[in-house]
From Swiss-Prot:
Miscellaneous remark of the record: Coordinated expression with SEPTIN6 and SEPTIN7.
Subunit structure: Septins polymerize into heterooligomeric protein complexes that form filaments, and associate with cellular membranes, actin filaments and microtubules. GTPase activity is required for filament formation. Septin filaments are assembled from asymmetrical heterotrimers, composed of SEPTIN2, SEPTIN6 and SEPTIN7 that associate head-to-head to form a hexameric unit. Interaction between SEPTIN2 and SEPTIN7 seems indirect. Also interacts with SEPTIN9 and SEPTIN5. Interaction with SEPTIN4 not detected.
Residue list for modification N6-acetyllysine: 190
Residue ranges constituting the Septin-type G domain according to the UniProt record: 34-306
Organism: Mus musculus
Location of the region described as G3 motif in the Swiss-Prot/TrEMBL record: 101-104
PTM sites of type Phosphoserine: 218
Principal subcellular localisation of the protein: cytoplasm
Protein name as catalogued: Septin-2
Chain positions with Phosphotyrosine modification: 17, 211
Gene3D superfamilies cross-referenced by the UniProt entry: P-loop containing nucleotide triphosphate hydrolases
Region ranges (Important for dimerization): 260-270
Gene Ontology CC terms: actin cytoskeleton; actomyosin contractile ring; axoneme; cell cortex; cell projection; cell surface; ciliary membrane; ciliary transition zone
Amino acid sequence: MSKQQPTQFINPETPGYVGFANLPNQVHRKSVKKGFEFTLMVVGESGLGKSTLINSLFLTDLYPERIIPGAAEKIERTVQIEASTVEIEERGVKLRLTVVDTPGYGDAINCRDCFKTIISYIDEQFERYLHDESGLNRRHIIDNRVHCCFYFISPFGHGLKPLDVAFMKAIHNKVNIVPVIAKADTLTLKERERLKKRILDEIEEHSIKIYHLPDAESDEDEDFKEQTRLLKASIPFSVVGSNQLIEAKGKKVRGRLYPWGVVEVENPEHNDFLKLRTMLITHMQDLQEVTQDLHYENFRSERLKRGGRKVENEDMNKDQILLEKEAELRRMQEMIARMQAQMQMQMQGGDSDSGALGQHV
């Protein structure tokens, strides 16, 4: 019978090397095996090319059966929530992407309450995550919290509309807002830059909190630092979306064909589509971390405070009931004591009368 050889643990050849440097590789393998989850919300008026842009970003068709409503249907139309989930795999890395669309936003004549449905949806996802996180089985929690919101701004105005301001202020403490100027091919380069500056000025004027890209670390390479600088300078992103392949300069590109030429979707000289996609991919982890550490924690703290106040009120009510019961008990004891005293006086009075009557006889 052969003797089994013991497992060999070999000392690293490099002096002073323990092996901790391999830990990131372990995390990477585990993350790749598990896959990634990301939820993107798109909000904006109809006709701004939201669906086309999302399909262009992820090279997929998320809305194959969508029916475009007519003008008459839009008059009384209410905001709906449509969540579409698709599994995307690229070089062995899986991404579970959920895109939350909001058809009907801004379509009705009276848009005063049109964003309440959207806010309720965001809060519901926080509430669901809090419930799952507090449960017994926390191993397979699906994260449907909204990590980023692309807010589409019309290129045909002179800046932000009152509805834009009201909506962004209503959600800026709940989700990461990335402002996007839609249909940038309707603007000249000068008009585009002027509109960007106007929007940024109004965002600052109304104290709207949009998503700010983190600064590049000092140890990052110069190319990444330059990329981060260009991405920051491009906000709000002015984009063009198209799923059509056309021929330009002897090659097939996605773009739009006009009598005066071709607008290429993925040409950074024509629009900010590539910059927007680069921002989303390179900062996807940061968007999730800000959602977890800032927006979700704010919701969780407020939720626990409300729960704490409820418990506190219940305790106060219980204390009040006990005090009232104790006061009622004291009143009854005092009443019984008075009755006993009266009965004792009556008995003493009766005994004295009987004694006087006996002496008289």
